[in-house]
């Protein structure tokens, strides 16, 4: 038994302007080399672009996009008897959101375009509509889990 106390789970802080935890999670994932102010600039510009494109509440578009990309199930490599199986596992809400944000940012970075704010806004709008690379990644993950359903008992 461990002599150390268990670590308390940290709660995600909210950003200063929108008071939203999802925005803060997005800022922390988009940040590179500790440049948080630049990450905030990119996010806020992307939010303005979403406002201009859709003429709706940009935070609802963000929520809808993340909800659409969040996976319910994923596969995890598990070594059993000398061979590695892809075992489907259920994903919790926090981990699912983190994966969704990672996929959205990855898809945004791959997009052709002028700047990151433009690419991110386009990807978020597409994801909210149900298309885009991030949605495709989620569907691919679900297909993999479905194909490897026979190994679900290896959990």
From Swiss-Prot:
Part of the 30S ribosomal subunit. One of the primary rRNA binding proteins, it binds directly to 16S rRNA where it nucleates assembly of the head domain of the 30S subunit. GO terms for molecular function: rRNA binding; structural constituent of ribosome. Keywords: Chloroplast, Plastid, Ribonucleoprotein, Ribosomal protein, RNA-binding, rRNA-binding. NCBIfam families: rpsG_bact. Gene3D superfamilies: Ribosomal protein S7 domain. GO terms for biological process: translation. One of its GO terms (cellular component) is chloroplast. This is Small ribosomal subunit protein uS7c. Belongs to the universal ribosomal protein uS7 family. It comes from Typha angustifolia. It is found in: Plastid, Chloroplast. Signal peptide: none annotated. PANTHER family: RIBOSOMAL PROTEIN S7. InterPro entries: Ribosomal_uS7, Ribosomal_uS7_bac/org-type, Ribosomal_uS7_CS, Ribosomal_uS7_dom, Ribosomal_uS7_dom_sf.
């Amino acid at each position: 038994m461990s002599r150390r106390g268990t670590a308390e789970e940290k709660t995600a802080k909210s950003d200063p302007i929108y008071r939203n935890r999802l925005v803060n999670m997005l800022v922390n994932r988009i940040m590179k080399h500790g440049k948080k102010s630049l990450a905030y600039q990119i996010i806020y510009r992307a939010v303005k672009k979403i406002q201009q494109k859709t003429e709706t509440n940009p935070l609802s578009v963000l929520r809808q996009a993340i909800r659409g990309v969040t996976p319910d199930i994923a596969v995890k490599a598990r070594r059993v008897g000398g061979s590695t199986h892809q075992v489907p596992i259920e994903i919790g809400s926090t981990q699912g959101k983190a994966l969704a944000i990672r996929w959205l940012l990855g898809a945004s970075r791959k997009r052709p375009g002028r700047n990151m704010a433009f690419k991110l806004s386009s990807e978020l709008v597409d994801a909210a509509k149900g298309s885009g690379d991030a949605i495709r990644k989620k569907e691919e993950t679900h297909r993999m889990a479905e194909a490897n359903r026979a190994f679900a008992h290896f959990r």
